[in-house]
């Protein structure tokens, strides 16, 4: 779990997302409250439930990106799902309980990786020993008059020399034959609602078939070392302990990001005739958000302390169109602002992995030096903003379209311009995009 303070979390988010201070503060406080709750003594700790967040704002302003970056900072089980993928129980489609099942799978993978990191150095030593056993078989018993001690000393000295060469990578390209455990056979079974437990038993029965069998393979030592390290680390893990920790991690620290929640409101679905009732999805989501127990293959998982962050553009609907019970489960509401020309300019250059840096790095691989003048950046931002105003407002995503169109010719012929410098200024931008950005019909289809 992350121990960062809210200010540190906001500072990290600022490296990747421009503006939206209110939303950043809300998620930073929510994340910090997970840590604070863990410090509270037990009877009261169970009563402290997370305050779920509803983010409201047009598309392309950073709602999903905030959630994505938060997942990396949280060091906790995190899943992002679209509310539109789910249907009311009884209809064809995914039911909402699968959210928790997917989350627990992510948690198990996360926990297993964390536990494997703890034993990796010991596993690496054992993997090295196995490779050295292949390269340097143990000497046969020495006959009459032989000096067994002397032979062992020689063998140990040779082993240490080979171990040093192995660690320095001098033996990486040498091939060895080794016996590796075959991975268990994966099998997916479509399960009707309520029959998950039975299908899990069938799946585990099939996965056990063939487990423990060895397969002889010829691989390079570099790959062999990795494969054997993973195999040795897996042997050291206690799978039951991993599952218990994973379930506990989901229950105490899990975060679910529900995107497009505005698309399942009743107003958004008026006059839809025979379409699946989206209001039914809201009713199915309600117990999950309120706190319920979901049956998974790793055991029962309580959702009482899972943090839910919902987001939606709410163009055609209002938050009040959600059913009242669900509205009450998202007490913290944050409105995200539309992006200005200055925001677009900052997105292009001010973030850690800005679009400008990405394209410069891509073209540098072909020895083309791409430079952006300040007036060129400003003009790009103005065009992106203007096209959003005139056509559909898709927020920062418009920049991808505009810059891709701008650099289309440079990217296409980069191989013929190795060692050259290309400067993107306002004149270059107008020459490449002027006609398209001015003509509304053209910009509708091209940008």
Curated annotation (Swiss-Prot):
Subcellular location: Cytoplasm
Gene Ontology BP terms: protein unfolding; proteolysis involved in protein catabolic process
Pfam families recorded: AAA, AAA_2
Gene Ontology terms for molecular function: ATP binding; ATP hydrolysis activity; peptidase activity; proteasome-activating activity
Ranges annotated as spanning the membrane: none
Binding site for ATP: 18, 60-65, 259, 325, 397
Family: Belongs to the ClpX chaperone family. HslU subfamily.
Assembly description: A double ring-shaped homohexamer of HslV is capped on each side by a ring-shaped HslU homohexamer. The assembly of the HslU/HslV complex is dependent on binding of ATP.
Summary of the function given for this chain in its UniProt record: ATPase subunit of a proteasome-like degradation complex; this subunit has chaperone activity. The binding of ATP and its subsequent hydrolysis by HslU are essential for unfolding of protein substrates subsequently hydrolyzed by HslV. HslU recognizes the N-terminal part of its protein substrates and unfolds these before they are guided to HslV for hydrolysis.
Protein name (Swiss-Prot/TrEMBL): ATP-dependent protease ATPase subunit HslU
């Amino acid at each position: 779990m992350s121990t960062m303070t809210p200010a540190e979390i906001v500072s990290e988010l600022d490296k990747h997302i421009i503006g939206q201070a209110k939303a950043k503060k809300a998620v930073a406080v929510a994340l910090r409250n997970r840590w604070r709750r863990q410090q509270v003594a037990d009877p009261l700790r169970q009563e402290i439930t997370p305050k779920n967040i509803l983010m409201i704002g047009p598309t392309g302003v950073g709602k999903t990106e905030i959630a994505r970056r938060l997942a990396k900072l949280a060091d906790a089980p995190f899943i992002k799902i679209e509310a539109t993928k789910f249907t009311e129980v009884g209809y064809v489609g995914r039911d909402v309980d699968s959210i928790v099942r997917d989350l627990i799978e992510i948690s198990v993978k996360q926990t297993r990786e964390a536990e494997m990191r703890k034993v990796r150095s010991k596993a690496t030593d054992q993997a090295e020993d196995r490779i050295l056993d292949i390269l340097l078989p143990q000497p046969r018993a020495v006959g009459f008059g032989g000096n067994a001690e002397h032979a062992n000393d020689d063998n140990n000295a040779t082993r240490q020399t080979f171990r040093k060469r192995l660690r320095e990578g001098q033996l990486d390209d040498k091939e060895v034959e080794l016996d590796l455990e075959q991975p268990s056979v994966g099998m997916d079974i479509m399960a009707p609602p309520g029959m998950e437990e039975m299908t899990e038993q069938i799946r585990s029965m099939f996965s056990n078939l063939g487990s423990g069998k060895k397969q002889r393979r010829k691989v390079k030592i570099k790959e062999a070392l990795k494969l054997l390290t993973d195999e040795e680390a897996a042997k050291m893990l206690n799978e039951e302990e991993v599952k218990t920790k994973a379930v506990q991690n989901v229950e105490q620290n899990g975060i679910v990001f529900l995107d497009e929640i505005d698309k399942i409101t009743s107003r958004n679905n008026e006059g839809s005739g025979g379409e699946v009732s989206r209001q039914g999805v809201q009713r199915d989501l309600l117990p999950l958000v309120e706190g319920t127990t979901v049956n998974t293959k790793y055991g029962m998982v309580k959702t009482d302390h899972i943090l839910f962050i919902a987001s939606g553009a709410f163009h055609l609907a209002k938050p009040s169109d959600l059913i009242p019970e669900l509205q009450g489960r998202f007490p913290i509401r944050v409105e995200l602002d539309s992006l200005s020309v200055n925001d677009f300019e900052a997105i292009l250059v001010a973030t850690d992995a800005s679009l400008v840096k990405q394209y410069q790095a891509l073209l540098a691989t072909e020895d083309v030096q791409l430079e952006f003048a300040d007036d060129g950046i400003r003009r790009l931002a103005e065009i992106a903003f203007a096209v959003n105003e005139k056509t559909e407002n898709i927020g920062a995503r418009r920049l991808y379209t505009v810059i891709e169109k701008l650099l289309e010719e440079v990217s296409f012929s980069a191989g013929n311009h190795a060692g050259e410098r290309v400067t993107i200024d306002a004149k270059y931008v107008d020459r490449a995009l002027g006609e398209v950005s001015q003509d509304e019909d053209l910009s509708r289809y091209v940008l």
